[in-house]
């Protein structure tokens, strides 16, 4: 998973992670710190840093698999984009699709 995907998932589900997992992900992905640098700052081993990051990533992926908030948000944005570009009848159809997505 790339940095953008992790950051996106963290923006949706970061509050569901432990504070330590969230902090480790922020330091590694947002602040671009190495495992060694994070280990020195936090006062844990590099292996513990790696474990914490891996667990955080795993939990973020599990949350998205179960809740699908990111996927649904992308679909809603696509429908809204379509609404902005079309005539009235098509706009009505897109609005209907949007309502259905929001009710899922």
Residue ranges and their predicted role:
Residues 1-9:
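Basic, low-complexity segments
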Residues 9-17:
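Short amphipathic alpha-helical boundary/capping segments
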Residues 19-31:
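Short amphipathic alpha helix immediately N-terminal
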Residues 38-39, 49:
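Hydrophobic positions on the alpha-helical face of helix-turn-helix-like DNA-binding modules
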Residues 52-55:
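Residues within the DNA-recognition helix of helix-turn-helix
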Residues 61-74:
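Short Lys/Arg-enriched helix C-cap and helix-to-coil transition segments
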């Amino acid at each position: 998973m790339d940095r953008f995907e992790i950051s996106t998932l963290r923006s949706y589900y970061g509050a569901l992670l432990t504070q330590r997992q969230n902090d480790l992900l922020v330091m590694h992905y947002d602040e671009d710190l190495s495992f060694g640098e994070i280990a020195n700052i936090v006062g844990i081993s590099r292996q513990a840093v790696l474990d914490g990051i891996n667990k955080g990533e795993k939990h973020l992926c599990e949350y998205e698999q179960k809740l699908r908030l990111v996927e649904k948000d992308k679909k809603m944005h696509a429908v809204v984009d379509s609404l902005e570009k079309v005539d009235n009848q098509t706009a009505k159809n897109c609005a209907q699709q949007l309502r259905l997505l929001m009710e899922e």
